[in-house]
Amino acid sequence: MRNAPTVYPGLMVPAMILVISTIIAGCSKNDDPDESEPQTKSVASCEGCHTNYAHLQEVYTPDTAAPAGGCGGEAPHYEPYDRVRMDGDGYEAFKQSSHYEIGCTGCHNGTDNTADKELAHSGDFISHPSVMAAEKCASCHQEIVDNFVTSLHNGTGQKRKVAIRSGFDGPEDFDQLPPHQIEGYNANCATCHAGCGECHVVRPPIGGGGLIDRHNFKKTPDMLNVCVTCHTSRGGHAYLGVAAGTQPDVHLTALDYTCLDCHDAGEMHGDGQPVEQRYAYSKLPECENCHTDLKSKNNYHSIHVEDFNCQVCHSQDYNNCGSCHIHGDGARIPSYLDFKIAGNPIPDVVPDFDLTLVRRTLAAPDNWEVYGVEYTNFDALPTYNYTTPHNILKWTERTDVGNGKACSDNCHIRNEGGALINKELYLFQEDLLEWEQSASSGITVDGKLPESWFEEK
């Protein structure tokens, strides 16, 4: 324990006089602004307005539409004045940053030093500067901006599929789509595809938008308020163990990992090289980065580690939904838990696996009906994607067999009196809806499993 300070009585009176003198001086007029109490900035300035909560409530403009919709559903609501408010610890941290030194109009354009709200936000004002990253961010972050053009967070993967199903070659042709279809994509599908700001400064639109920490720039995005806000129904839903009967991912419960422990900044920002889809990306994390010598770990691995992806054994049931009616009815196949093993949909990208987990996508022939657009080549891609659910456990319904049972008891199909046990784990042609069959029949397991599995014992 630290020793108490020694008190010297002879010094008490002078000290008291000094304190009293200081108090008196503090009550007198002080012409030195550096020594005075902090002053409220004038509302006739960007910073003064956005740090004056009462004034924001007086001058705000009510919303005329929700900030986002799309497949994520209705976004949570934050009042307009709460979305742009700057105060508290976040604002104080922002003031200590190099971004603060740039000044409000340095990033947002517009006009400073005016109480006229319309004038302040007039002309070339931009609410989200990172949509013009080449102009606003590149002077300090040139490499990141250059690489981000091909980042999956910039939407290249989804744009690729829309373009291919529309009869084009890939994401580079996206701008050739009808303008109203592009408008619909931006208003719906793109609400989760992010620029710099949506990870580092503001909530993604699907999370309600607005400053996430009073304009503080977060170098490391917050997992719940940023990552899971977009990756809700498929990523966060699984990783946090939200669904009934599921458990959180072991990487969360045992290691307290956040998304950035596996998916680092290099992966998020991109490397400038275009890829067909996310599993072709060079910086994608692999289980083997941490789990070495997998083949020799146990009998399960020695038999199957080269046959299918790790999630076939170690994933729990995961969320699916499908048939999105964009800007209309939304997902007409509502979310449901499922587990499907199918033929590898991307053998050119992940050539090592014959069987993989797959997840139903939102694709449907009439995705763009509201916008008067029909796909011309819908069958070019399957309606189920290769998937790696983030709900890993060592012991799952597939791996945790009963005492005395064969290790394959919960995963191989077997015929017991005409009943095919475990058949529901696999994607068969009969599982496809009529409009899915032509696009997805190539990845079903029909004719690809051992005949002995179907013979009655």
PLM-predicted stretches and their roles:
Residues 2-25:
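Sec-dependent bacterial lipoprotein signal peptides
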Residues 22, 27-206, 216-457:
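C-type cytochrome heme-c attachment and multiheme electron-transfer modules
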